[in-house]
């Protein structure tokens, strides 16, 4: 029997370690560099960040739950985004880890730049556990999260064609290209609110 998929907010009582692992697995460039390809350390630090006032705070994470297990996550923020460098450094300390020059580079080249983004909602991370992939969970998770009255922004690696197709199927459109962290070609994508779409069409004669 197919297990029911539930889309809901993350709570502090959930399996935070799994959520931290999924955040780490979201991006094969930023997080392996930031944590020197040490996933166990990353899970500890990111777990502390989820509990603190950082860009990963649990109140900004939507989950897909299948059979009681967290199968996927969306990390999001309402603009303006607060990167919270101090809180991130404190999370490193609580995890008995050292925030070295790699953290500083990622903060300056990625996290810090988020504070200058436009209005709307920024989707920072989308990830489905490898054990649950191929079941349409990412589409269901995003479909349960997105609302017509909001404008959403995200970035996608250009070579990740499957992700780009998914976002386009959900109403996102490419609005720009840029060189992402480590020189990786990326797209900026936006899903305008329903109100914006109606406004754009209001002057068209029927």
Regions found by a protein language model. Name each.
Residues 119-121, 148-159:
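Conserved GNAT acetyl-CoA-binding A-motif
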Residues 80-121:
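Conserved acyl-donor/pantetheine-binding loop and adjacent beta-alpha core of acyl/acetyltransferases
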Residues 153-164, 170, 176-206:
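C-terminal "cap" of GNAT-fold acetyltransferases
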Residues 28-49, 93-97:
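Conserved GNAT-fold acetyl-CoA-binding loop/helix
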Residues 6-21, 30-33, 79:
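A short beta-loop-alpha structural element at the N-terminal edge
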Residues 1-14, 195-206:
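Conserved N-terminal entry element of GNAT/NAT acetyltransferase domains
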């Amino acid at each position: 029997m197919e297990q029911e998929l539930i889309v809901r907010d993350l709570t502090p009582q959930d399996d935070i370690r799994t959520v931290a692992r999924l955040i780490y697995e979201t991006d094969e460039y930023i997080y392996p560099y930031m944590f020197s390809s040490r996933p166990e350390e990353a899970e500890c630090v990111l777990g502390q960040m989820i509990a603190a006032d950082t860009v990963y705070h649990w109140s900004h994470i939507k989950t897909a739950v299948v059979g009681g297990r967290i199968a996927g996550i969306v990390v999001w923020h309402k603009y303006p985004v607060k990167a919270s460098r101090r809180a991130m450094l404190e999370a490193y300390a609580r995890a008995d880890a050292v925030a070295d020059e790699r953290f500083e580079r990622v903060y300056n080249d990625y996290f810090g730049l988020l504070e200058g983004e436009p209005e709307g909602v920024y989707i920072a991370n989308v990830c489905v556990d490898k054990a649950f992939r191929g079941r349409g969970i990412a589409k269901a998770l995003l479909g349960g999260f997105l609302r017509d009255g909001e404008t959403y922004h995200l970035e996608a690696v250009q070579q990740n064609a499957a992700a780009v197709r998914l976002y386009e199927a959900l109403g996102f459109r490419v609005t720009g290209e840029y060189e992402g962290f480590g020189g990786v070609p990326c797209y900026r994508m936006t899903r305008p609110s329903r109100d914006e779409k109606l406004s754009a069409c209001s002057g068209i004669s029927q």
